[in-house]
Amino acid sequence: MIKTEYYKDLTKMNTFGMKVKARCFMEYDSVADLVDIEFEDLARPVLHIGGGSNLLFTDDFKGTVLHSRINFIEILDVPGNTDTSCHPEHSEESPTPVLVSVGAGVIFDDFCDWAAKEGLWGAENLSYIPGEVGASAIQNIGAYGVEVKDIIHKVYCYDTVEEEFVSFSLEECGYGYRDSIFKKPEIKGRYIVTHVVFALSREAKPQLGYGHLRDAVMASVAGVSDDPRLLQRHPLAEGGMSQETPATEAHDPRVTPAVIRRVIIKIRKEKLPEPSVMGSAGSFFMNPVISADHYQKIEAAAKAELGVDYKVPHYDLPDGTVKVPAAWMIEQCGWKGKRSGGAAVYDKQPLVIVNYTGDAYPEEIIGLERRIIASVKAKFGVELHPEVDHI
């Protein structure tokens, strides 16, 4: 069934809580509904949203907003399946992956919760990321050393131009850091994700190399503490990265997907604002990737300013470049906790810009964004780029 509303209030459909309306809003329940939508006749522009967690509406939307309610989670029955090509991680020696088909309208954290309860590995580190499954495959969401591309097998879509259903393999999705083929300007908006097939595992595969995540998880299973501040000893507790430590130790059977999920949820709740209480889009900026020489200059300046023993948080990439957390740069520029009108930099996580008063204007958020970008550029010679889409 397709439900159409005009001049729909979108305040509760974007996590920033921007008080905007859409000229036309269409919500559909099934894959078959997409065939019945006359895309050529829709008011332009056309925007498909998920949970509205990565958007900043700058004004009322003068076109059509689409939203999926395709809601199912299903383990695919593939008896005798020997296809280990669904993900590079799997080989002939490793167990056959568990393929799970999930509707685009499923809340992503509901999928993570389901997987953990089923004892399936792969999605636990992505727990509590806001948004829906369809948008996760477009954005390539990630957290705590894992990106959604690490568990995607195939993405199924409706091609609004050719009016046909198509699928994209992992390789065809062209995933990069918070990027995919679906975000390329030449095809952005053409494909509507209907469902995603994930490749999970029944074999224990904990990814605990991020910051002090391993410490927090092991403390939890040992009954020492569930305190998320265990992870805060690392300056990149959320929104950054650390040099991963190899998981060479034997797997502790007490560590399950549910345990890791519980710890990560505690950490995220401690570090990030609850959208229902204080609007935000989560991480506002992407972490910049710079040359090794540029990083050395930043590190030298930091040691001169903060002491010779100071270590700039970073992650060395395979191609020789270095990823430095935007959160660290923003905090070093003095923005943590600063307000500008109704907008503010979150006092517990400088990577997050919040709708502090609940009625911030888009211009206030954009103004704060621009000032942060300018100050980071002036201090570090690095240009930050927003992760949030400006609509």
Task: For each feature predicted by the language model, list its residue ranges.
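Beta-rich strand-turn-strand
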Residues: 120, 362-368
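Structural preference for long, well-ordered alpha-helical segments within the folded cores
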Residues: 368-371, 375
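A cross-taxon signal for low-complexity, glycine/charged-rich
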Residues: 80, 90-101, 219-254
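Anion-binding (especially nucleotide phosphate/pyrophosphate-binding) glycine-rich loop
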Residues: 1-155, 159-162, 172
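Short hydrophobic-aromatic micro-motifs
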Residues: 26, 56, 65-66, 100-102, ...
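Residue-level signal for inorganic ion chemistry
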Residues: 30, 52, 131, 163, ...
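Phosphate/pyrophosphate- and phosphate-bearing ligand-binding catalytic cores of soluble enzymes
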Residues: 5-7, 11-18, 55, 166-227, ...
